[in-house]
Design a protein with these regions (language model features):
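Active-site beta-to-alpha loop of glycosyltransferases that engages the nucleotide-sugar donor
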Residues: 1-8, 30
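Short, acidic, metal-binding catalytic loop of nucleotide-sugar glycosyltransferases
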Residues: 11-21
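Short beta-strand/loop segment that forms part of the nucleotide-sugar
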Residues: 21-31, 56-60
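Active-site-proximal specificity loops/subdomain of glycosyltransferases
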Residues: 41-109
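Short aromatic/hydrophobic "clamp" motif used to bind/position activated sugar donors
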Residues: 115
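C-terminal catalytic/acceptor-binding lobe
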Residues: 220-315
Length: 315
């Protein structure tokens, strides 16, 4: 529901790495507010040419709920789980289409070796695509490259950091499972499936075949919302179990807050450059529900890229 922010993000990406992108996949979560019409507008497609813009609308609004895809039952869904919750895989009130899961439409349809995944609130200032591609070229076992984190949700944040993880440090024998702040340090988080560690998918790149392999072997999707984990966190743990590598080419000392400034990353991109996470437009993430400044972004598109946003479609 923020087409202006998404298009501005894509314009900044095109400016710094346009020749490295072939196609863009946009999954609209049933916005029903004119966003799809904007993405398909002739002026938008002409601006981004020769990129191919692939736009899809979900079969139903998923928001941050879990999609139960028949045939894909992850390990915590044991017989005890299925005794009382088996109906979730057939209930028509529950989403079941795998392409309604974040990023899965692109992962299932791209013919490229690597897929760049981004949020709609990122401002690119330097070519991070080449940085990630070099990381994959240097390590054939690499499955994902990007911004490591979610430290603000982990009780190990005081003794751990992305930089330490990338140097080989592990905060417990249970890693990448992580106890929450209310649990004792020696708690086996496998009992609760708590997961903080991940590669933050607001800007990351995956090896498509390795990503698909983890999905098939572990029956979990990269972008699904599994028990006690945010997007990509459950998949990240299963990727580690599969023996694949990960990398943050720009690891920070610490990430005590979701919006902590990270000079290492900001040389290449600025996440939440509008001053708030994108989801805060709809939900209170600790700072109240914030106002989406559509006009500011429209003005930036005109000032920085000379693009006249299709005003007739706003509203």
């Amino acid at each position: 529901k923020k087409p202006e922010s998404l298009l501005y993000t894509l314009m900044t990406l095109k400016k710094v790495a346009g020749d490295l992108i072939d196609a863009v996949y946009i999954n609209d979560d049933c916005s029903n507010d004119g966003s799809v019409e904007i993405y398909n507008d002739r002026r938008v497609r002409e601006y981004f040419s020769p990129w191919k813009l692939n736009v899809r609308v979900n079969t139903r609004n998923v928001h941050i709920s879990q999609v139960y895809v028949p045939g894909y039952r992850v390990d915590y869904m044991d017989w005890k789980f299925m005794l009382t919750k088996w109906h979730r895989f057939i209930d028509p009130r529950v989403p079941h289409n795998r392409h309604d899961i974040r990023y899965q439409y692109a992962l299932d349809n791209t013919d490229k070796k690597y897929l760049l995944i981004i949020h709609d609130d990122v401002k690119f200032v330097k070519d991070v695509v080449s940085l990630y591609l070099k990381a994959f070229a240097d390590n054939p076992n690499l499955a994902v490259a990007g911004d490591f984190g979610q430290c603000w949700r982990c009780r190990f944040a005081a003794v751990c950091s992305p930089k330490k993880i990338m140097s080989g440090f592990r905060p417990s024998r249970w890693w990448p499972l992580t106890p929450t702040s209310g649990e004792p340090a020696d708690f086996n988080p496998a009992n609760g499936y708590t997961r903080a560690c991940r590669i933050n998918e607001w800007c990351c790149m995956v090896d498509v075949e390795k990503c698909r392999d983890v999905t098939e072997r572990k029956r979990c999707f990269l972008g699904n919302m599994y028990k006690y984990s945010d997007t990509t966190a459950f998949w990240f743990g299963k990727m580690v179990e599969c023996g694949y590598d990960f990398i943050d080419p720009l690891p920070s000392e610490a990430l005590p807050k979701q919006l902590a400034r990270c000079p290492e990353h900001e040389e290449y991109y600025i996440h939440a450059w509008q001053g708030h996470p994108g989801h805060s437009v709809w939900a209170d993430q600790g700072m109240g529900i914030v106002k989406y400044n559509r006009d500011e972004i429209v003005d930036l598109m005109k000032a920085e890229f000379g693009f006249d946003f299709p005003q007739k479609l706003i509203g």
